């Protein structure tokens, strides 16, 4: 009988287009990056498009921004623009996200001299759309498609642009109103299978990378104490659905096989599979739907990325149709993550 070798070193999972896992939405980021089952907002496009069905306004547009914080680099950022349109029983959403990695100097050494040949600006972007349909009074589902493009290598070095297609499927349950004495409450559930798609090669000779496919499950509880004050608590679990690296590297599997086997392929068995689950909890206070305070906590195991942070956030509406949100995380990781920085949103709601 073979005995599992639990002493093997656990390895973190690397994927193509890692910027898809960077959260530049200040609403979600302020709540520990929960989103799959939290209350709907315009940035539901990325975390659970089916939530658009339950928004009170028919359409809105928003921009979001997150900079890279390092004294030596000032032009690295992730930003995006999002739009949605809701009808009676369905909704459409669209998003464009752009990740700039700044200017890279191309140099050549001749003798003891280093010459600058020019500059190169690595970038990645995603263009996506979604469709959501209300299936019952309290439940909706949505699908999203996503075109991805990455230019990380120097154009003269063979293949310079990597492209991929991906899709999401999501569902959201938003309960009817219930009462405990004079207190009104709702409960929510959500799921999302995200970034299912083609494998990616960044150059002609390199290996293929999986997209950052994830399964997210979440639940939420909304409590309204009176007509002005509302509280929301959300919890979420996230699991990579790509092969876990072993001693030989990353197994080469087709997409369906990778999805199915990702629940049981970790070299250290169930313990390592459990370590691959990220956990998040978020709390939000709303006053008259015009002022918001948020906080949350995100946990990722130290062997699988070591992202641990406490986040805070706030938002407010102005001129009736506008809303601004900001969030900031306080990291507890053993290393400094340059993307643990502030996030900023600006939202405009039509016809409010």
Residue ranges of predicted features:
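Subset of outer-membrane beta-barrel
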Residues: 8-352
């Amino acid at each position: 009988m073979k005995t599992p070798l639990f002493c093997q070193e656990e390895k973190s999972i690397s994927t193509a287009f890692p910027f898809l896992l960077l959260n530049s939405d200040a609403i979600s980021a302020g709540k520990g990056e929960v989103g799959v089952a939290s209350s709907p907002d315009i940035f539901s496009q990325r975390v659970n498009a089916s939530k658009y069905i339950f928004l009170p306004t028919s359409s809105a547009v928003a921009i979001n921004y997150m900079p890279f914080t390092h004294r030596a680099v000032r032009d690295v950022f992730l930003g995006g623009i999002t739009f949605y349109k809701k009808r009676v029983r369905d909704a459409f959403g669209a998003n464009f996200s752009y990740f700039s990695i700044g200017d890279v100097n191309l140099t050549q050494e001749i003798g003891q001299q280093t010459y600058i040949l020019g500059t190169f600006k690595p970038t990645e972007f995603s263009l996506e759309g979604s469709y959501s349909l209300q299936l019952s009074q309290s439940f909706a589902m949505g699908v999203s498609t996503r075109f991805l493009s990455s230019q990380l290598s120097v154009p003269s070095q063979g293949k310079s642009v990597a492209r991929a297609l991906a899709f999401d499927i999501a569902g959201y349950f938003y309960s009817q109103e219930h009462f405990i004495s004079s207190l009104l409450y709702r409960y929510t559930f959500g799921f999302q299978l995200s970034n299912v798609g083609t494998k990616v090669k960044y150059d002609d000779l390199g290996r293929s990378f999986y997209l950052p496919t994830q399964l997210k499950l979440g639940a939420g509880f909304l409590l309204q104490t009176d007509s002005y004050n509302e509280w929301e608590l959300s919890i979420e679990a996230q699991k990579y659905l790509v092969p876990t690296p072993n001693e030989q590297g990353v197994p080469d599997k087709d997409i369906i096989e990778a999805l199915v086997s990702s629940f049981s392929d970790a070299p250290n068995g169930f313990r390592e599979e459990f370590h691959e689950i990220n956990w998040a909890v978020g709390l939000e206070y709303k006053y008259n739907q015009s002022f918001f305070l948020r906080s949350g906590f995100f946990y990722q195991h130290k062997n699988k990325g070591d992202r641990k942070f406490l986040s805070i956030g706030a938002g407010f509406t102005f001129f009736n149709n506008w809303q601004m949100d900001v969030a900031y995380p306080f990291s507890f990781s053993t290393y400094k993550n340059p993307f643990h920085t502030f996030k900023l949103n600006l939202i405009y709601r039509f016809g409010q």
